[in-house]
Structure formats: C-alpha cells, structure tokens
Amino acid sequence: MEEKLEQAYLYDFYGELLNEHQRQVYEDFVFNDLSLGEIASEEGISRQGVADLIKRCNKKLLDYEAKLHLVEKFMSIKSDIRRIHELTNDFKKSHNELLMNEIEAISNQILEEL
C-alpha cells in the first residue's frame, strides 16, 4: 500500500488515540500536504522536531495496528465485498449456481471475521 494511503487509513482508525497536538501536526503533514518547514513555522518548533513528531505518530499508529489489526481486517473485508460484487455481476450473466455458492462462502467468511 502506498505510504500516504497507509498513513491515512491508520489515522482514520487510530487518530483519535493521538493527543491534539500530534493530530494537528500529523493532519497537516498527511492530509494538508504541508512541508516540514511550513509545519515547523506554524507550530513554532524546528523542522527536526516536526520530523521526529511525525515519526513517533507513525510508530504509535503502527503499534496500534499491530495489536488491533483494524486496518488489515477492513482491507480484507473490502476485498471480499469487491469479490462478491464481481461474482454477483457474473451470476447475472450466467445464472451459474456455483457462483452463488461462492458468494455465500465469502459472505459467511466476512461474518465470521466480524
């Protein structure tokens, strides 16, 4: 997964676990696409301080993911739903019962994961 996209997913799931200052700096870097220098000027800290803070935030978010696996589960379910969508379209064309069996198996797997 692209680094910025991964950072966005991690933030979406775990961002509220960061303190307000960490969230602001992380949002400015990841979502608002501000440079380290721009953030440093805005926050009144050094560029190195901003870089260190972003690195610590990334580590925290990755640690949460390592323990909770919410992004991993989300991506897995998203992939399964995409596959169900494809199979449904195929079924509309062919009316093949085997496709319905596969859809049922995937949906059962999703329910077990939840």
Swiss-Prot record:
The lineage of its organism: Bacteria, Bacillati, Bacillota, Clostridia, Lachnospirales. It holds the Pfam family UPF0122. PANTHER family: UPF0122 PROTEIN CBO2450/CLC_2298, UPF0122 PROTEIN YLXM. Might take part in the signal recognition particle (SRP) pathway. This is inferred from the conservation of its genetic proximity to ftsY/ffh. May be a regulatory protein. This is UPF0122 protein EUBREC_1504. Belongs to the UPF0122 family. Coiled coil: none annotated.
